[in-house]
Amino acid sequence: MNVRLFASRFVPKINFLNKSFGKKPFRLLDVGAGNHSATKIKSVFPSCEYHGLDLNKDYNNSEEDFALMHAFYEMDLTQLKMETIPNNYFDGIWLVHVVEHLYNGEEVMKALLPKLKPGGYMYIEYPGIKSTKLPSMYGSLNFKDDPTHVRIYSYQKLSNLFTENNCLVLGKGVRRSFGFIIAMPFRILAYWLSGKKLIGNIFWDILGFAEYLWIQKNPNQ
C-alpha cells in the first residue's frame, strides 16, 4: 500500500488528483503553487509533470520545490495574458483557494480552458457563501479574515459557466473531508498539547467553509 497516497486521501486537492488520474502519468498546472505544493504532490504522484503558477515566487517554496517543477509561470492572472502557457497541453488544472483573490475569476477560468486537453480535468476550491457567516478566527474561518479575499463565488453559477463552455460537471458542492472531520478532535488536542494557537482550517470541513467544483473538458472537443 502507498501510505502517502492513503493519508493524502484526506486532502481534497490530492484526493481529486487521485480520482482523476490514479496511477497514470499526467501533466498538471497547479495555479497557486505555494506552501511546498510541488513537493507534496510529487511525493504522492512521482510521475506527475508538475507546472506551477503564481503571482510571484515568494509563497513559501524552497529551491527543492522549484527543482521539482517542469516549469513555473509567474504572472498576474487578472491581466488574462497567458500566452506563455501552452495550449491543449495539460491533463489537469487545479485552482485551490485562488479565485477568491480574483475579481474576474470567471474570465480567468475561461482563459485557462484552452490550456487543458480534451478530456482533461479542472478542480476549483474556494471559500463559499457560508464562510461569510462563520466567526472570525486566526488562520481564516470567516471570508473577511483574509484581507486579500475580494469576491465570493458559488458552485451553482460556476457550474453554468463550465456547462456553457462545453465541459462536464463531475462534482460540486460544499467541501466535506470526512477524514479531516474525524481527525478534528485529535488535531485540536495536538495543538493544545504543543501550545500552538488553533487555526481556522481545522474547522473548515465540519462547518462547511469551502465549496468545490470538479469538471472535465468535453473529450470530443
What are these regions (language model features)?
Residues 96-99:
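Residues lining the SAM
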Residues 4, 78, 92, 103-114, ...:
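S-adenosyl-L-methionine-dependent methyltransferase catalytic module, highlighting the catalytic core
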Residues 85, 114-115:
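Short, charge-rich binding segments
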Residues 1-88, 92-94, 106-109, 172-174, ...:
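Conserved N-terminal segment of class I S-adenosyl-L-methionine
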